[in-house]
């Protein structure tokens, strides 16, 4: 059963990214499941750190993008969410290809939410685990 309170398509989700950091980093929403939101991000010159590896800040941006959008999908008209805390643990370096982010709820309260976002490389190996806290406003 879908947990989402807003009924948006992947095309509509991706349209919200135009002219934002999300678009600049090449992040694309790829799956909206019953209790999961997924997106991909390229690992290339836009997301590398100086030594040719995926920048931890880019991983954090993907995680916050997914968690914030998932949080928004859990709100009703007149409400929005804002991030309150982001934690990222980097497990494995990635130098090329894409990473896939998988966002799932840990806690869905009336005033706050917690999301787990796991990033995987193209071989399906976990490369980063994040937790995002959000506050529901409005």
UniProtKB/Swiss-Prot annotation:
Active-site residues per Swiss-Prot or TrEMBL entry: 64
Gene3D superfamilies cross-referenced by the UniProt entry: Hotdog Thioesterase
Main location, first listed in the record: cytoplasm
Highest taxon above the source species: Bacteria
An annotated GO BP: enterobactin biosynthetic process
Database matches in Pfam families: 4HBT
Pathway given in the UniProt record: Siderophore biosynthesis; enterobactin biosynthesis
Segments crossing the lipid bilayer: none
Any one cellular-component term (Gene Ontology): cytosol
Alphabetical keyword list: Cytoplasm, Hydrolase
Subcellular localization(s) per the UniProt record: Cytoplasm
Subunit-level organization: Homotetramer. Dimer of dimers. Interacts specifically with the aryl carrier protein (ArCP) domain of EntB.
Family, similarity comment: Belongs to the thioesterase PaaI family.
PANTHER family: 1,4-DIHYDROXY-2-NAPHTHOYL-COA THIOESTERASE 1, PROOFREADING THIOESTERASE ENTH
Official protein name in the record: Proofreading thioesterase EntH
The organism of origin for this protein: Salmonella arizonae (strain ATCC BAA-731 / CDC346-86 / RSK2980)
Organism taxonomic ancestry: Bacteria, Pseudomonadati, Pseudomonadota, Gammaproteobacteria, Enterobacterales
Record gene name: entH
